[in-house]
A protein has these predicted regions:
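Receiver (REC) domain switch-region micro-motif
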Residues: 12
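C-terminal alpha-helical cap of glycosyltransferases
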Residues: 118-147
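An anion/phosphate-binding loop that grips the pyrophosphate of nucleotide cofactors and donors
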Residues: 9
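Catalytic binding pocket for nucleotide-activated donors in carbohydrate/polymer assembly enzymes
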Residues: 6, 15-115
Protein backbone atom coordinates (compact mmCIF):
# COMPACT_ATOMS: atom_id res chain seq x y z
CA UNK A 1 0.00 0.00 0.00
CA UNK A 2 2.75 2.50 0.92
CA UNK A 3 4.38 2.11 -2.46
CA UNK A 4 1.15 2.65 -4.40
CA UNK A 5 0.31 5.76 -2.38
CA UNK A 6 3.84 7.10 -2.58
CA UNK A 7 3.71 7.14 -6.39
CA UNK A 8 1.07 9.89 -6.39
CA UNK A 9 3.10 12.08 -4.03
CA UNK A 10 5.48 14.64 -5.58
CA UNK A 11 7.80 14.93 -2.56
CA UNK A 12 7.92 13.04 0.74
CA UNK A 13 8.69 15.42 3.62
CA UNK A 14 10.44 13.45 6.34
CA UNK A 15 10.10 14.40 10.01
CA UNK A 16 13.41 15.68 11.43
CA UNK A 17 12.92 14.49 15.01
CA UNK A 18 12.37 10.81 14.24
CA UNK A 19 12.85 9.90 10.58
CA UNK A 20 10.97 7.47 8.41
CA UNK A 21 12.54 4.04 8.39
CA UNK A 22 10.78 1.29 6.41
CA UNK A 23 8.42 3.88 4.96
CA UNK A 24 11.42 5.80 3.60
CA UNK A 25 12.63 2.69 1.78
CA UNK A 26 9.14 2.08 0.37
CA UNK A 27 8.81 5.69 -0.76
CA UNK A 28 12.22 5.61 -2.45
CA UNK A 29 11.40 2.30 -4.14
CA UNK A 30 8.38 4.04 -5.68
CA UNK A 31 10.72 6.69 -7.09
CA UNK A 32 9.30 9.49 -4.97
CA UNK A 33 11.99 11.94 -3.79
CA UNK A 34 12.41 12.17 -0.02
CA UNK A 35 13.51 15.39 1.70
CA UNK A 36 15.07 14.87 5.11
CA UNK A 37 16.87 16.75 7.86
CA UNK A 38 19.18 14.72 10.10
CA UNK A 39 18.65 17.18 12.97
CA UNK A 40 20.61 15.41 15.70
CA UNK A 41 23.99 13.83 14.96
CA UNK A 42 23.82 11.83 18.21
CA UNK A 43 20.37 10.29 17.51
CA UNK A 44 20.27 7.44 15.04
CA UNK A 45 16.52 7.92 14.56
CA UNK A 46 17.24 11.44 13.28
CA UNK A 47 19.84 10.27 10.75
CA UNK A 48 18.09 7.16 9.44
CA UNK A 49 16.34 8.60 6.37
CA UNK A 50 19.52 10.33 5.16
CA UNK A 51 21.35 6.99 5.27
CA UNK A 52 18.51 5.21 3.48
CA UNK A 53 18.37 7.96 0.85
CA UNK A 54 22.14 7.79 0.23
CA UNK A 55 21.80 4.04 -0.26
CA UNK A 56 19.00 4.51 -2.80
CA UNK A 57 20.83 7.10 -4.90
CA UNK A 58 23.16 6.10 -7.71
CA UNK A 59 26.92 6.34 -7.23
CA UNK A 60 28.61 9.25 -8.96
CA UNK A 61 28.00 12.96 -9.55
CA UNK A 62 24.24 12.71 -10.19
CA UNK A 63 23.66 10.87 -6.91
CA UNK A 64 25.95 13.23 -4.98
CA UNK A 65 24.10 16.28 -6.35
CA UNK A 66 20.73 14.74 -5.52
CA UNK A 67 21.89 14.08 -1.94
CA UNK A 68 22.83 17.77 -1.58
CA UNK A 69 19.32 18.74 -2.70
CA UNK A 70 17.43 16.21 -0.56
CA UNK A 71 19.42 16.14 2.71
CA UNK A 72 19.08 19.49 4.45
CA UNK A 73 21.67 20.81 6.88
CA UNK A 74 19.32 23.10 8.82
CA UNK A 75 15.64 23.84 9.29
CA UNK A 76 16.04 26.85 7.00
CA UNK A 77 17.54 24.65 4.27
CA UNK A 78 14.78 22.08 4.76
CA UNK A 79 12.10 24.71 4.20
CA UNK A 80 13.96 26.34 1.29
CA UNK A 81 14.56 22.98 -0.43
CA UNK A 82 10.91 21.95 -0.05
CA UNK A 83 9.56 25.27 -1.33
CA UNK A 84 12.09 25.44 -4.17
CA UNK A 85 11.42 21.91 -5.37
CA UNK A 86 7.66 22.40 -5.08
CA UNK A 87 7.62 25.72 -6.93
CA UNK A 88 9.90 24.34 -9.63
CA UNK A 89 7.49 21.54 -10.51
CA UNK A 90 5.15 22.18 -13.42
CA UNK A 91 2.80 19.87 -15.25
CA UNK A 92 2.53 19.82 -19.02
CA UNK A 93 -0.68 17.87 -19.42
CA UNK A 94 -0.15 14.99 -17.02
CA UNK A 95 3.63 15.06 -17.41
CA UNK A 96 5.72 16.59 -14.59
CA UNK A 97 8.60 18.89 -15.57
CA UNK A 98 11.30 20.34 -13.30
CA UNK A 99 14.01 19.26 -10.90
CA UNK A 100 11.57 17.24 -8.79
CA UNK A 101 10.60 15.22 -11.87
CA UNK A 102 14.30 14.69 -12.66
CA UNK A 103 14.94 13.47 -9.10
CA UNK A 104 11.99 11.06 -9.36
CA UNK A 105 13.38 9.63 -12.60
CA UNK A 106 16.87 9.34 -11.09
CA UNK A 107 15.57 7.46 -8.04
CA UNK A 108 13.25 5.23 -10.03
CA UNK A 109 15.99 4.21 -12.46
CA UNK A 110 18.57 3.75 -9.68
CA UNK A 111 16.47 1.09 -7.93
CA UNK A 112 18.07 -1.71 -9.93
CA UNK A 113 21.67 -0.68 -9.20
CA UNK A 114 21.58 1.05 -5.83
CA UNK A 115 23.21 -0.38 -2.72
CA UNK A 116 19.96 -0.13 -0.74
CA UNK A 117 17.99 -2.41 -3.03
CA UNK A 118 20.80 -4.85 -3.89
CA UNK A 119 19.20 -7.88 -2.26
CA UNK A 120 21.62 -10.37 -3.81
CA UNK A 121 24.61 -8.58 -2.29
CA UNK A 122 22.85 -8.32 1.08
CA UNK A 123 22.07 -12.05 1.11
CA UNK A 124 25.62 -12.91 -0.01
CA UNK A 125 27.09 -10.77 2.79
CA UNK A 126 24.71 -12.29 5.37
CA UNK A 127 25.61 -15.82 4.27
CA UNK A 128 29.29 -14.93 4.44
CA UNK A 129 28.79 -13.61 7.99
CA UNK A 130 27.07 -16.87 8.98
CA UNK A 131 29.98 -18.88 7.53
CA UNK A 132 32.55 -16.77 9.39
CA UNK A 133 30.58 -16.99 12.65
CA UNK A 134 30.36 -20.78 12.30
CA UNK A 135 34.09 -21.10 11.58
CA UNK A 136 34.93 -18.94 14.61
CA UNK A 137 32.60 -20.97 16.82
CA UNK A 138 34.15 -24.26 15.65
CA UNK A 139 37.64 -22.88 16.43
CA UNK A 140 36.48 -21.65 19.83
CA UNK A 141 37.00 -18.03 18.86
CA UNK A 142 34.67 -15.14 19.53
CA UNK A 143 34.61 -11.54 18.51
CA UNK A 144 33.14 -9.34 15.86
CA UNK A 145 32.70 -10.20 12.21
CA UNK A 146 33.85 -7.62 9.68
CA UNK A 147 32.53 -7.75 6.13
Amino acid sequence: MHISRARVCDLFLDTPECNAHTTAADVLWSGTPLLTLPRYKYKMCSRMAASILKGALPKGPAGEQAAKELIAGSEEDYEAFAVGLGKGLKYVGHRPVGRLAELRKLLYEARWNSALFDTRRWVRDLEQAYDIAWEKWVKGEGGDIDL
